[in-house]
Amino acid sequence: MEQLQATFDKLLRETSTTFHRYMYNRINWDARMIGLMGPRGVGKTTLVLQHIKEQLPRKDSLYVQAEDFYFASHRLTELADSFAKMGGKYLFIDEIHKYKDWARELKLIYDYHSELHIMFTGSSVLDIAKGAFDLSRRALMYKIQGLSYREYLELFHGIHFPACTLDQLMQQEVDIPNGFLPLEHFADYLQRGYYPFSDGDIKMYIQQVVNATIETDIPQYADLTVSTARKLKRLLAIIAQSAPFKPNMSQIGGQLEVSRNNIADLCTYLEKAGLIGQLRTSTGGIQGLGKVDKIYLDNPTLIYTLAGKNVEIGTVRETFFFNQTRSLMPVTVSPISDFLIDGKYTFEVGGKKKKQNQLQNIENGYVVKDDIESGYGNIIPLWRFGMLY
């Protein structure tokens, strides 16, 4: 316990509180059990430590990492028992997916220690409703993704810009601060700005995130063999070189020597882990149940990291739009254009010379153009979709 406390103190000292992710003020910190899920490298640990540092008494709090060597000889329930007996009130467990019986033991801690507030973070691959120890009725769950363009501007350039809604974008109600050049940093954001890494070789860091996700997180959750994990990496490479594409599961399965159904499962794991995005057909408003129409890499920064020289700017634009909108609202494939949001707003994404041919006589149709600073009528600048959170 002493070593855990010492590690906790060191992490608190090293935690900066000058910038907060969008999720920081959306979490109901009063809930008895909170789960924060998200891909690797998007700032979950920092967010938790910031909350402790700014809002909680140190003596009442304990932060631990589930992969700490302490848990080689101690159980999570033992730690909670000891912490509660010492008067502890707030227990934070980072990377819970690295602890084997995490769901069962969190349930026991919740049921036996009503005096404790528990927060855990984990890979977005996890499904808390899966299995015998369903936490979905106990934990208030949140999912966080990488930096928006708005957050990138604040973190790396000190430019503060309020978040806006989709309605404000469509109504052209987004005010540009005096002197702000919206395109000045946009290309850099697309290439390297989705993950909050500031020092060193950004591309190397992102490759490490991808490798750890594929080699550790997904196999651990899905109980995959080493051979299947290798095929997962090959599948991601295929997607990186050809996204967006209409998936032919049988053809891909033949390349990887995996059944069609298994390919669909592997794609689902990659999607949950924040490595790809699957654009589906509409199913009467039930998001996530439609047929997969196109597969994208999750975000533009992944494209520049994984696709090498095969970077198509049109793909980058569509990927950015899909990534920034789908975490906030239902996004499906449009039968006449690129994307359909909320089942009623049609969006065509392209460069500044993009025409409106496909949207003629279409109600609620919008053209999203790159390389323009301001919008008019039904034309919206692409960069503004980075202001949604």
Write out the residue ranges for each language-model feature.
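N-terminal pre-Walker A segment at the start of P-loop NTPase domains
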Residues: 1-26
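Interdomain motor-coupling "hinge/lid" segment immediately C-terminal to the ATP-binding subdomain
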Residues: 2-10, 123, 130-236
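Hydrophobic anchor at the beta1->P-loop junction of P-loop NTPases
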Residues: 36
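Conserved lysine of the Walker
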Residues: 44-45
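Short glycine-rich substrate-engagement loop in P-loop NTPases that contacts/grips substrate
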Residues: 58-90
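Structural recognition of the conserved hydrophobic beta-strand(s) that form the central parallel beta-sheet
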Residues: 92, 117-123
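Accessory nucleic acid-recognition modules appended to NTPase machines
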Residues: 194-337
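Conserved catalytic cores of phosphodiester-cleaving nucleases, focusing on short active-site segments
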Residues: 321, 325, 339-355
